[in-house]
């Protein structure tokens, strides 16, 4: 499975559809200004801005208040303590559910009985209402606006279409705010065409798959016109204990084709296999 397909599947609860990367590339050919916006949204600076936004949400997203059910009451101050102390390590939009489970256990212990399905739903709705919103699409749109970018179209779920430039930032926001499925059972991930992966994609790969990860690529074959030096920033994400193997001997083409291609790409350190053909 490609990383794009994985991302689209993980975002199904946020948007019903996402733009394909090749559609974005075609769009950028006729709208060159769009290309710069794509790289801006994949950058470390953009990610740092999002981290600042996540910290702001810890307070701005919450409306914590007293909870009462029949003769049972838990004060807002107690809920605040649970939310910001006991369960602080849980991502923000999953944290109140942990508080709810704690309160349900407390109530059932005091009442000497289990809550029925209808009561469980009531507890859930009341505690989820302490969030101003849990909609990742809305939260990301607000973030874009806060950093001076155009917000996403304000439409119902069924009409949402996420541009490719926003796919991985939205996925990062979701994984930062929700307790998502871990992938610790996966022991090996192979990344092909490594030259086409952005900073934020590598950050997500590192976060999702803490396993061995061979990265394969060809710096002379990027999808995008703007090239990035992946090897320069990878140690900042994966640490300096990485091993680089450069294979610069070409077996696929005749010397005439390879020399012509190297002139176009500016590659000078390629070792050519001595096999001749027609002049180019």
Placement of each model-derived feature along the sequence:
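P-loop NTPase motor core
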Residues: 2-66
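Hydrophobic/aromatic-lined pockets within catalytic cores
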Residues: 55, 108-111, 209, 213
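Short, flexible loop segments at the rims of nucleotide/cofactor-binding pockets, characterized by
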Residues: 36-39, 166-168, 190-194
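Conserved helicase motor core of SF1/SF2 NTP-dependent helicases
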Residues: 3-14, 19-22, 154-155, 175-188, ...
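Catalytic cores of large soluble enzymes that bind and process phosphate-bearing ligands
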Residues: 42, 95, 249
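Conserved helicase NTPase catalytic core signature
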Residues: 62-188, 198-202
């Amino acid at each position: 499975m490609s990383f794009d397909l994985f991302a689209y599947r993980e975002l199904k609860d946020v948007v019903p559809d996402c733009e394909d990367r090749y559609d974005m590339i075609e769009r950028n050919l006729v709208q060159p200004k769009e290309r710069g916006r794509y790289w801006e949204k994949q950058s470390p600076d953009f990610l740092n801005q999002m981290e600042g936004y996540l910290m702001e949400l810890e307070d701005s997203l919450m409306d914590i208040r007293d909870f009462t059910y029949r003769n049972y009451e838990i004060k807002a101050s107690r809920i605040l303590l649970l939310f910001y102390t006991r369960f602080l390590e849980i991502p923000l939009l999953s944290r109140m559910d942990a508080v709810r489970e704690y309160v349900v256990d407390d109530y059932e212990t005091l009442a000497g009985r289990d809550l029925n399905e209808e009561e469980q739903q009531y507890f859930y709705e009341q505690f989820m209402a302490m969030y101003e919103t849990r909609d990742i699409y809305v939260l990301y749109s607000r973030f874009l606006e806060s950093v001076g970018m155009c917000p996403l179209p304000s439409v119902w779920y069924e009409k949402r279409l996420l541009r490719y430039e926003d796919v991985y930032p939205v996925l990062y926001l979701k994984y930062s705010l929700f307790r998502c499925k871990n992938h610790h059972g996966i022991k090996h991930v192979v990344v092909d065409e490594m030259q086409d992966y952005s900073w934020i994609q590598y950050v997500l790969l590192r976060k999702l798959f803490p396993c061995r990860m061979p990265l394969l690529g060809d710096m002379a074959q990027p999808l995008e016109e703007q090239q990035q030096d992946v090897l320069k920033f990878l140690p900042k994400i994966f640490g300096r204990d990485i091993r680089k193997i450069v294979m610069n001997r070409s077996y696929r083409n005749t010397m005439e084709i390879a020399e012509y291609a190297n002139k176009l790409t500016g590659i000078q350190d390629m070792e050519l296999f001595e096999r001749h053909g027609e002049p180019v």
